[in-house]
């Protein structure tokens, strides 16, 4: 039995097909909900590592997780865009603060706040119990 759709109409249907299929492809970047627990875990790790590596005398805390994407690699790679702000909590040698403690730190007055937009890449391999911060850029 022949289709009653004219050739141009069936061609249009074929062209529309990719728009109804899932947008992500294996190995490609997929948008993630910023409230997803795995994304939140990667964000916590990124902020803790940022503070551990930073030479700033004060801690920075997360203001907002702006955007998150992930990629299936050997594990999962998270691409996070976050807003950070410098707190009034000073770093002390040998006694680093954890994420929750830092989130409770007070902020300087609004006109004295130092804010950063940071892009983090976090590579998680749970079966190895290993997470790495592979890239950080802040401005």
From Swiss-Prot:
<protein>
    <recommendedName>
        <fullName>Cystatin-1</fullName>
    </recommendedName>
</protein>
<feature type="signal peptide">
    <location>
        <begin position="1"/>
        <end position="22"/>
    </location>
</feature>
<dbReference type="InterPro" id="IPR000010">
    <property type="entry name" value="Cystatin_dom"/>
</dbReference>
<dbReference type="Pfam" id="PF00031">
    <property type="entry name" value="Cystatin"/>
</dbReference>
<keyword id="KW-0646">Protease inhibitor</keyword>
<feature type="domain" description="Cystatin">
    <location>
        <begin position="27"/>
        <end position="127"/>
    </location>
</feature>
<dbReference type="GO" id="GO:0004869">
    <property type="term" value="F:cysteine-type endopeptidase inhibitor activity"/>
</dbReference>
<keyword id="KW-0964">Secreted</keyword>
<comment type="function">
    <text>Inhibits various C1 cysteine proteases including cathepsin L, papain and cathepsin B. This protein has no toxic activity and its function in the venom is unknown. It may play a role as housekeeping or regulatory protein.</text>
</comment>
<keyword id="KW-0789">Thiol protease inhibitor</keyword>
<feature type="short sequence motif" description="Secondary area of contact">
    <location>
        <begin position="71"/>
        <end position="75"/>
    </location>
</feature>
<keyword id="KW-0732">Signal</keyword>
<dbReference type="GO" id="GO:0070062">
    <property type="term" value="C:extracellular exosome"/>
</dbReference>
<dbReference type="InterPro" id="IPR018073">
    <property type="entry name" value="Prot_inh_cystat_CS"/>
</dbReference>
<feature type="site" description="Reactive site">
    <location>
        <position position="27"/>
    </location>
</feature>
<comment type="similarity">
    <text>Belongs to the cystatin family.</text>
</comment>
<feature type="disulfide bond">
    <location>
        <begin position="118"/>
        <end position="138"/>
    </location>
</feature>
<keyword id="KW-1015">Disulfide bond</keyword>
<dbReference type="InterPro" id="IPR046350">
    <property type="entry name" value="Cystatin_sf"/>
</dbReference>
<feature type="disulfide bond">
    <location>
        <begin position="89"/>
        <end position="105"/>
    </location>
</feature>
């Amino acid at each position: 039995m022949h289709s009653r759709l004219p050739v141009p109409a069936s061609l249009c249907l074929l062209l529309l097909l990719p728009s109804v299929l899932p947008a992500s492809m294996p190995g490609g970047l997929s948008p993630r909900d910023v409230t997803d627990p795995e994304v939140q875990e990667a964000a916590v790790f990124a902020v803790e590592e940022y503070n551990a590596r930073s030479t700033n005398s004060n801690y920075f805390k997360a203001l907002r997780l702006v955007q998150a994407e992930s990629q299936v690699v050997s594990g999962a790679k998270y691409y996070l865009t976050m807003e950070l702000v410098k707190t009034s909590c000073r770093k002390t040698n040998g006694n680093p603060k954890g994420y929750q403690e830092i989130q409770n730190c007070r902020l300087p007055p609004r006109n004295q706040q130092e804010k950063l937009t940071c892009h983090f890449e976090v590579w998680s391999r749970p079966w190895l119990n290993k997470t790495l911060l592979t890239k950080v850029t802040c401005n």
